[in-house]
Design a protein with these regions (language model features):
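Amphipathic alpha-helical hairpins
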Residues: 1-184
Length: 184
C-alpha cells in the first residue's frame, strides 16, 4: 500500500480496492452461473451479476465525488477468494454438493465485500461525506441482501443433500442412556 497521510487518502484506497473487487467479480460470477446446476442458484447469481455492474457504476460516481480515479489498484484479497472459489467449480461431486460449494464460495465473497463497504462507510461518515456514505450504504444493503439470499438457499440445499444421503453412509446414532429415568 502506498504511503498515506490522511483519512481521505485511506478512503480513496478503500474505494479503489472495492472497485477492483467488483470488476473481478464481473468476470468470476459468469463462471459460477455456468457451473451451477440449480436453476434458482443460477437466477440468483445472474441477478447479483447485474447488481455488481450497478455497484461498479456507483463506485465510479463515488470516485468522481472524491476526485480520484477508481481504477489502478488490484484487490489481492478478492483475487485470492476468487481463486479459492474457482476450485469449487472443479470438484467432482453430486449436483447438490457441487452447488453448495459454489454457494460457500459466493458467501465468502459477500462477507469480504461487506467488510470493505462497512470500513469505507465508517471513514466517509467520519469525514462527513454524506453523499458518498449514502451510495456506499446502498451497496452494503445490496450485499447483505445477496448474503441473506445465499444463506437461505444454502440451508435449503443442505437439507436436501443431507436427507438424500443413504442411511448406510451416515454413522449409526448413539443412544445415550436416560440418566433421569427412575430405577426401581
Amino acid at each position: 500500500m502506498a504511503s498515506m497521510k490522511s483519512a481521505n487518502e485511506l478512503l480513496a484506497e478503500e474505494i479503489k480496492d472495492l472497485y477492483s473487487a467488483e470488476k473481478q467479480l464481473t468476470k468470476a460470477i459468469p463462471k459460477m452461473i455456468a457451473g451451477a446446476k440449480d436453476p434458482q442458484l443460477k437466477a440468483g447469481l445472474t441477478a447479483h451479476l447485474d447488481e455488481t455492474k450497478q455497484q461498479i457504476v456507483r463506485l465510479e460516481t463515488i470516485a468522481g465525488l472524491l476526485e480520484i480515479k477508481a481504477s489502478g489498484k488490484v484487490c489481492k484479497g478478492m483475487e485470492g477468494i476468487i481463486l479459492e472459489g474457482a476450485e469449487a467449480l472443479t470438484v467432482d461431486a453430486p449436483s447438490l454438493v457441487f452447488d453448495l460449494g459454489i454457494i460457500a464460495a459466493a458467501r465468502r465473497v459477500e462477507h469480504y465485500e461487506m467488510a470493505g463497504y462497512m470500513t469505507a462507510i465508517a471513514i466517509a461518515e467520519e469525514l462527513e461525506l454524506s453523499e458518498v456514505t449514502g451510495l456506499l450504504q446502498e451497496t452494503l444493503f445490496e450485499e447483505k441482501g445477496a448474503e441473506d439470499s445465499l444463506k437461505s438457499h444454502f440451508a435449503g440445499l443442505l437439507v436436501k443433500a443431507v436427507s438424500g444421503e443413504t442411511a448406510s453412509a451416515r454413522p449409526p446414532a448413539k443412544r445415550t442412556p436416560n440418566v433421569m429415568a427412575k430405577t426401581a
